[in-house]
Amino acid sequence: MDYKETLLMPQTEFPMRGNLPKREPEMQKKWEEMDIYRKVQERTKGRPLFVLHDGPPYANGDIHMGHALNKILKDIIVRYKSMSGFCAPYVPGWDTHGLPIETALTKQGVDRKSMSVAEFRKLCEQYAYEQIDNQRQQFKRLGVRGDWDNPYITLKPEYEAQQIKVFGEMAKKGLIYKGLKPVYWSPSSESALAEAEIEYKDKRSPSIYVAFPVKDGKGVLQGDERIVIWTTTPWTIPANLAIAVHPDLDYYIVEANGQKYVVAAALAESVAKEVGWEAWSVVKTVKGKELEYVVAKHPFYERDSLVVCGEHVTTDAGTGCVHTAPGHGEDDFIVGQKYGLPVLCPVDERGYMTEEAPGFAGMFYDEANKAITQKLEEVGALLKLSFITHSYPHDWRTKQPTIFRATTQWFASIDKIRDQLLDAIKETKWVPEWGEIRIHNMVRDRGDWCISRQRAWGVPIPVFYGENGEPIITDETIEHVSNLFRQYGSNVWFEREAKDLLPEGFTHPSSPNGLFTKETDIMDVWFDSGSSHQAVLVERDDLERPADLYLEGSDQYRGWFNSSLSTAVAVTGKAPYKGVLSHGFVLDGEGRKMSKSLGNVVVPAKVMEQLGADILRLWVASVDYQADVRISDNILKQVSEVYRKIRNTFRFMLGNLFDFDPNQNAVPVGELGELDRYMLAKLNKLIAKVKKAYDSYDFAAVYHEMNHFCTVELSAFYLDMAKDILYIEAADCRARRAVQTVLYETVVALAKLIAPILPHTADEVWEHIPNRKEQVESVQLTDMPEPMAIDGEEALLAKWDAFMDVRDDILKALENARNEKVIGKSLTASVTVYPKDEVRALLASINEDLRQLLIVSAFSVADESYDAAPAEAERLNHVAVIVRPAEGETCERCWTVTPDVGRDESHPTLCPRCAHIVNEHYSA
């Protein structure tokens, strides 16, 4: 007889290899056919709502690793929430206006000068939709579940209509104003930029020390002194109207090289060194406030430069006397307003000097640096020229330097709502906690928000002008424009005359003849996405404001978190979110930024093509995403190895359930043996830990707990030990059904617990669970497992955890014996232990077969104590152990070594247990 035929070996169609790149798209097709998103929403209808509001990615180009990290994190949360008592809709969105799309079209050869603004905007819209379709497919390939057929898009009419209402509401509260003000200006984009559109990069600039001759010393100075300033922007010298000093600082009048100079006392030493005064002496000391209203002379124009006082002056660098050009700096502008100085800005929108800078008109500002420095040298005002490399603001899109330039712009007042904003920040939960400090400081220190842009592709600023140039914004005009946009989209603004955009019969005191013009600037794109709390959360029936969570990269403290907060507090007085969670950036394996030049870019599409989305998702779960994270082929290899172990654990459990029906074969929990109950108690512990980790967005803990449970608790212990029962015993034997009961409960619970992270694999496992109690087609339509009721659970855990420590000792002794060639496999061993007293009682209380638990052929507890163990025994923590080769023959069926093999003459190669099973169940 072939005894192999009498073994109950595992059977399952669940494949050992994931082959995810091929299998995942098939699974996704199935989800689409069953309309899984709608099914989940229907099943969870009426539960408390949990809204994770999607920050919209920009609709341009393929998705990168940062997108993948972001969308997968969101998906894990949404999937978990919908399996734990919430209705968790997920509406993805796209940000679609702005310069990158204009630039992309220009690169494609579109000549925007040859068409109307409205025509150009139609091409922009078409391009945006193409990009959305491309990105949507890539996001879906990641396994992200959402309302992909009805996303929110910032260029959709209903979105724009709500955005106009946000603007109108802010205007009504006096928070929108038009003003001349220095703003970040990008000559390369020919537009104003918001702070969120600025990035700092190193730039080489000239560093000059310039002497301004004193014209009127106002009785404090004699009139033969020269005030020394320092600047790295010589091109702003033509716009100089003042010199700022700090009222409370001491200033020296210094004599050097036969001349007298004014510098801050604290900086005199460093200035002398820098400009090369070898012998210098202090003639007089004065306070900054004494110098107020002293008149100096512009170095090369016939014009005065007034000494003014400003709190912004520091002694960090320079001379303590600050060159002040109100048209080219925020502090300069503010101090200029205080002293009634004009706002002079002799630079045009392309960065070229104008006629207001005689002698330099027509020069690009950066080129003018040289000519102006030469002019200063000619007139004897230049004390020193050198070059420095410093961190300087650049346009985040064109990567070119920006300048400060005073222009007429539309602003949203931050100042008027600053206290409310800071209160709203306090009431929000920020994770990580440093996020709160970061956004608090940003809001505390930021200026008013410049919301106008001089571009074509964006939402128009809905303002009309009367015949006298007065801006008109009324409830009536806002309501009308909002309705027009809802009906026709914002292109209508560029297709119609002002009169056709106003309500029928509209009149206004500023236009006695009924003539109106319209604003041509558009809104900053951050105003677009920043209005989503109204344009999406309020607009849609399935969502609500405030959202439970905003989750984006840490660059969004100054971006979307900030603009959303500003508009929401302005309109509603409250934050648009209850909680904000931020993640770091994706770096390469060595912690470097990814760049084409370094050749270290990891592309999500490629990872999915080679390894699958579930591997990428498992990587996301494995990292500490609140800081910057690393990815490389090597890191993904390690993650794939963990995936393989988890998958193999599932496969083993599924394979050993092939003949198990939980409705008929399950053993009630109360009737299970201690070890089986212990495993269910361990499963209970896992369920509690994993759910707690999901609740606190600690996915790395989920990853580690699941990995540990599969490899240590299951594979290395219970499943290994259970083979002897599962394969060897008769099919319907009580011990075998007990183990299968544990496996069934475990496989169902693990499939659910891992489903938010590995949705494809979890559903594949789900399909292969034989005779499932829950007859639903996807694990996504179930809830997270609940712990089972187990009598005396804590005592059980304490007892068996203690046994596991003893087992570790014995395994160590077996390992040593194997290395010393005393035994081969552990089943060839006979083990004798000499326990410490408390361990003796523990071993005596165990009813299970200790041979089976330790996978050895003979096991005995010696009468002698630990201390009295013979010299040959290996002394370990809890027991002393002697390992010898087991005596007897090897049973052909179960591989146990015993002297009793062949006792049943009809089965000369079997042990009595196997002979009995074969006689009872397999004899013809």
UniProtKB/Swiss-Prot annotation:
Annotated catalysed reactions: tRNA(Ile) + L-isoleucine + ATP = L-isoleucyl-tRNA(Ile) + AMP + diphosphate
Cofactor binding note from Swiss-Prot or TrEMBL: Binds 1 zinc ion per subunit.
Needed cofactors: Zn(2+)
Complex formation: Monomer.
UniProt-recorded name of the protein: Isoleucine--tRNA ligase
Gene that encodes it: ileS
InterPro entries, sorted: aa-tRNA-synth_I_CS, aa-tRNA-synth_Ia, Anticodon_Ile_BEm, Ile-tRNA-ligase, Ile-tRNA-ligase_type1, Ile-tRNA_ligase, M/V/L/I-tRNA-synth_anticd-bd, Rossmann-like_a/b/a_fold
Intracellular or extracellular location(s): Cytoplasm
Top-rank lineage group of the source organism: Bacteria
Main location: cytoplasm
GO cellular component, one term: cytosol
Keywords from the UniProt entry: Aminoacyl-tRNA synthetase, ATP-binding, Cytoplasm, Ligase, Metal-binding, Nucleotide-binding, Protein biosynthesis, Zinc
Binding-site list for ATP: K596
Phylogenetic placement of the source organism: Bacteria, Bacillati, Bacillota, Bacilli, Bacillales
Disulfide linkage: none
Enzyme class: ligase
GO terms under biological process: isoleucyl-tRNA aminoacylation
Domain-level remarks: IleRS has two distinct active sites: one for aminoacylation and one for editing. The misactivated valine is translocated from the active site to the editing site, which sterically excludes the correctly activated isoleucine. The single editing site contains two valyl binding pockets, one specific for each substrate (Val-AMP or Val-tRNA(Ile)).
GO MF, one example: zinc ion binding
Role summary: Catalyzes the attachment of isoleucine to tRNA(Ile). As IleRS can inadvertently accommodate and process structurally similar amino acids such as valine, to avoid such errors it has two additional distinct tRNA(Ile)-dependent editing activities. One activity is designated as 'pretransfer' editing and involves the hydrolysis of activated Val-AMP. The other activity is designated 'posttransfer' editing and involves deacylation of mischarged Val-tRNA(Ile).
Enzyme Commission code(s) on record: 6.1.1.5
Short motif 'HIGH' region, span: 57-67
Chain sites annotated for binding Zn(2+): C891, C894, C911, C914
UniProt similarity note: Belongs to the class-I aminoacyl-tRNA synthetase family. IleS type 1 subfamily.
Coiled coil: none
Stored Pfam families: Anticodon_1 (PF08264), tRNA-synt_1 (PF00133), zf-FPG_IleRS (PF06827)
Motif 'KMSKS' region mapped to chain: 593-597
